[in-house]
Amino acid sequence: MAELLIELFMEEIPARMQVRAGEDFRRLVTDRLAAAGIQFQRAEVHTTPRRIALVVEGIPARQADVREERKGPRVGSPEQALQGFLRAAGLTDISQAEQRDTGKGVFYFAVIEKPGGATIDALPALIDGAIRDLPWPKSMRWGTNQFRWVRPLHGILALFDGQVVPGGLTIGTAEPPPETSEGNACLAGEATARVIRYGNETKGHRFLSPDTLTVTSFEDYKAKLRGAHVILDREERKQLILAGARAAAEAEGLVLKDDPGLLEEVAGLVEWPVVLVGGIDEQFMDVPAEVLTTSMRTHQRYFALETTQGKLAPRFVVVANRPTVDGGAAVVAGNERVLRARLSDAKFFWDQDLATPLETRRQALADIKFHEKLGTMLERAERIEALAVEIARTLGLDTGALERVRIAARLCKADLVTGVVGEFPEVQGILGGHVARAQDLPADVADAIADHYRPLGPSDRVPADPVAVAVALADKIDTLVAFFAIDEKPTGSRDPFALRRAALGVIRLIVENGLRASLLPLFGRAAVAVPAAAGETVGGDLLSFFADRLKVALKEKGVRHDLIDAVFGLGGQDDLVLLLKRVDALAGFVASEDGANLLVAYRRAANILRIEEKKDGVSYSGGGIDAGRLEQAEERALAAALDATAADLAPLLAAEDFTGAMRLLSALRGPVDAFFDKVTVNAPDAVLRANRLRLLARIRDTLNGVADFSRIEG
């Protein structure tokens, strides 16, 4: 078995594009191998800032022979049909075809045997196609070439079983020299193709090892690159950076602030990582830590360091792409100089922002359009203020807390017009909280402003303080109601206004804080302030949307989506905490033996009723059972059990004891099983039959009073 090694060597690939490009290239090559009938065992891709390297192992040196059968026309068909068959099958005479009786007549069959060729012969076109089809978010031309690529492509290494794959990639044409004054006597001829030939050479680190390397295999390639100061494996580079940064932090008595996203990006910026530590001038340390961290991370790709108490330290980690003779002193000094300029701007904005009260800044929100159909950001802030106070009342907050909710909601968007947020949009909300503290607003008001966007995702922290919870809920519910009102709902993968995230945020805020709040009245209250909203329609659509989001949120916890459907099927289930209590109890019920068997009996009853109700054109639900026509002991026992269950079930449901309610339903298993074993529902006597169908309807209705059992799968 042979090995295919391909390296695309180029100028620096943007770090954010590398992993996706590597996976795309692996897929394009392996898909083409499979389409060509070339088997392989495994494919592995690596990326660095200057190269995409793919190795495919376990490829046969020769392609397998192919035997193909092609059915032709019936024996005795017209000559024209026979000639068409011969041409399509590559035969010269009909005697070369076989005659077979298919049971539907005798037909001609062509047996075409194609000997497998050398695999290397199929590779040039395969590699060319994979390179040309590689998608880039952005691409460019360079020089006079027609070929587009993310950055100028310098070389293509292509080896199969140690041999260079013949051919190359045409990237453009070289124009012939212009005519001389003597006419075309010196004309060199037609334009010639510019081709990057496949070869067995690459280069190491741009500065440390710029010489050409000749390789013979993937192992040789990896080893020679390492010797030339290139660590090919991205994960290894990440681990080296992480270990080096942690060690550097520990040497300073500090702790590295975890930042997986930045680690991923920095691993795509260096081929030979060298970790260095720099300092932040003390004059900048009164700027909020989030602003400093964002500036270092976004603009400079520095890792922040913290004290053991979690406070930002005046030190940072920078990762260079090579060691230096001075131990990195010049590199650190240069980075500190650049950072000083960056943070000078941040400090200027911070000082300016502190000078103006948030209430004064709030008026400038009238100049920011939230959405062309939904008014300005000031109008949105007013909606959030009114809704947050309503939510706070629902949660039972006292008068003082209600006022703090009102202030926090009123000011939560004011930092959008600050200089710091204009420079660093990532700190919106957080910056407002810092300004509020500096301007002596109550601590829980400042915290609510800082946290009103939270949670930002499934793993983000959920606010727990009641003031913050009320404002965060109002922010998200206003967003959801407003965009649903103008029919900007998520569709498929399209969710430009992050409404799925907002709904998940509402779910987490309510569930993780155990809040007893009905969503529909809140949706209705929010809809009143949105000119385009039709309250009932928006509320119903949103509740269905929340049901879908709840399924997604709980799927990771192993909760079955059909159980959520069954509880939502009751209608009006907009108290999420109560709903989840029902779901938990229902999950325990269907997992028990009695519950599973009763579910089977429910389906049997429901199926009989569906057929008979359709046939009779009536519903048997709600009709009284004639006790005098309960002829068999089993039907009398079932009727008595249903009466007892109904009497005991209502107080359990009122007390929200859903586990007790499910336990009560489980006791119906015996009478229901006995009924189906001994009683004929469709009796010849029409009155008796109707009475028994009403008894089945009681089974269905009793269970459906706890959950819509028709939606439970399995």
From Swiss-Prot:
InterPro entries: DALR_anticod-bd, Gly-tRNA-synth_bsu, Gly-tRNA-synth_heterodimer. Its EC number is 6.1.1.14. It catalyses: tRNA(Gly) + glycine + ATP = glycyl-tRNA(Gly) + AMP + diphosphate. One of its GO terms (biological process) is arginyl-tRNA aminoacylation. Pfam families: DALR_1, tRNA_synt_2f. It is found in: Cytoplasm. The keyword Repressor does not apply. The keyword ATP-binding applies. GO terms for molecular function: arginine-tRNA ligase activity; ATP binding; glycine-tRNA ligase activity. Keywords: Aminoacyl-tRNA synthetase, ATP-binding, Cytoplasm, Ligase, Nucleotide-binding, Protein biosynthesis. It comes from the Bacteria. Coiled coil: none annotated. Tetramer of two alpha and two beta subunits. This is Glycine--tRNA ligase beta subunit.
